[in-house]
């Protein structure tokens, strides 16, 4: 089996796992707690960083990985998971870790681009030939269309999905929040199951054959074409989407206790180097420094109108998180779980 198919199969057994790896021969071991669909990216980055660190310092470093829905991962770190670094799906999740006292409040200003070494967006993955003729967000609200997306309570990607749909509705209905809510309610009425993370939703759609369209991270959609077959799926780019900015941070409490700050900071800084930026683009993420990427990797990214979380429509994560995703927020108001009877 190819690597992506193997990852999907493994996810069915364990939705949250650390890569099994002995640190017996490592001078330093770091734990990178990341969001769901970054496995392939960080496998490549970790190998490159370990090689560079060895050449620079003579020391051996081992980076272990943990993956799951971004919100779930943030909660694990808040509850005591000893992560040296987090590479999560959105600022709001790292802010929650900072509020718990495990990260210094200034974390987002330590690295370039608000500590986001790459960006992504949300696209649609449909079955080959696009049998339901899905072209844009309003097609997702039609009768007879099944939409696969994760749970925004646990998944960062799911929150980006929701906000992209909200931005489309707001543009369509002229900033009428009640109509925006109704649009989102209709969309989620077409969702048969909410997985906890993005990779789980990919499994549901691609492996289990459920649904007509998957709301996917752009990188996850390209990876599905590459690993599961371009003869099985098509990518549809909507007229408008969201500028997803996944940030990274050192867990100050952990690195100071373990004495791993120097290597942990070097690891995150490495993400901004030309070598890592090239790997980022090759793994289907949009690099913060496009000049470092291969042109053939950049060519796959569609030119699409992207709305920022800092747009007045959302007002940043400090406003968007409680308004839309907190207990009793808009998502709770509009979503009715499917009956299991």
Q: Language-model segments: what does each one mean?
A:
Residues 13-14, 24, 36:
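Cleavable N-terminal signal peptides
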Residues 27-155, 295-298, 335:
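N-terminal segment of the mature folded domain
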Residues 33-35, 126-128, 146-173, 188-191, ...:
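Short beta-strand->loop
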Residues 116-120, 182-188, 195-196, 228-261, ...:
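Periplasmic-binding protein-like
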Residues 129-135, 154, 167-175, 254-262:
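Short helix-loop capping/hinge motifs at secondary-structure junctions, enriched
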Residues 172-239:
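Ligand-binding pocket segment of bilobal, Venus flytrap-like solute-binding proteins
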Residues 255-341:
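Extracellular/periplasmic juxtamembrane helices and adjacent flexible linkers that interface
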């Amino acid at each position: 089996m190819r690597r992506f198919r193997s990852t999907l199969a493994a996810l069915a057994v364990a939705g949250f796992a650390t890569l099994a790896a002995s640190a017996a021969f490592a001078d330093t071991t770091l734990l990178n707690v990341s969001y769901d669909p970054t496995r392939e990216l960080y496998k490549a980055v970790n190998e490159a960083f370990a090689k560079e660190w060895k050449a620079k310092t003579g020391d051996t470093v081992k980076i272990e990985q943990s993956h799951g829905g971004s919100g779930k991962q943030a909660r694990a770190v808040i509850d005591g998971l000893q992560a040296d670094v987090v590479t999560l799906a959105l600022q709001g999740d790292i802010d929650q870790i900072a509020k718990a006292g495990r990260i210094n409040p200034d974390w987002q200003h330590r690295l370039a681009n608000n500590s986001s070494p790459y960006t992504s967006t949300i696209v649609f993955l449909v079955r080959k030939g696009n049998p339901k003729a899905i072209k844009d967000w309003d097609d997702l609200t039609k009768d007879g269309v099944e939409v696969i997306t994760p749970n925004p309570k646990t998944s960062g990607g799911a929150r980006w999905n929701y906000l992209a749909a909200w931005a489309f509705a707001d543009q369509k209905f002229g900033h009428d929040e009640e109509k925006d809510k109704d649009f989102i309610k209709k969309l989620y009425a077409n969702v048969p199951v909410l997985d906890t993370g993005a990779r789980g939703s990919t499994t549901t759609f691609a492996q289990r054959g459920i649904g007509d369209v998957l709301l996917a991270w752009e990188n996850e959609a390209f990876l599905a074409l590459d690993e599961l077959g371009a003869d099985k799926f098509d990518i549809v780019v909507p007229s408008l989407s969201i500028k997803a900015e996944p940030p990274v941070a050192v867990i100050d409490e952990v690195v100071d206790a373990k004495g791993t700050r120097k290597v942990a900071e070097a690891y995150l800084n490495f993400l901004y180097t030309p070598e890592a930026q090239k790997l980022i683009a090759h793994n289907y993420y949009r690099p913060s420094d496009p000049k470092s990427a291969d042109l053939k990797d950049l060519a796959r990214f569609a030119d699409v109108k992207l709305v920022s979380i800092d747009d007045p429509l959302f007002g940043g994560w400090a406003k968007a998180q409680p308004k839309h995703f907190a207990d009793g927020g808009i998502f709770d108001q509009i979503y009715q779980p499917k009956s299991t009877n």
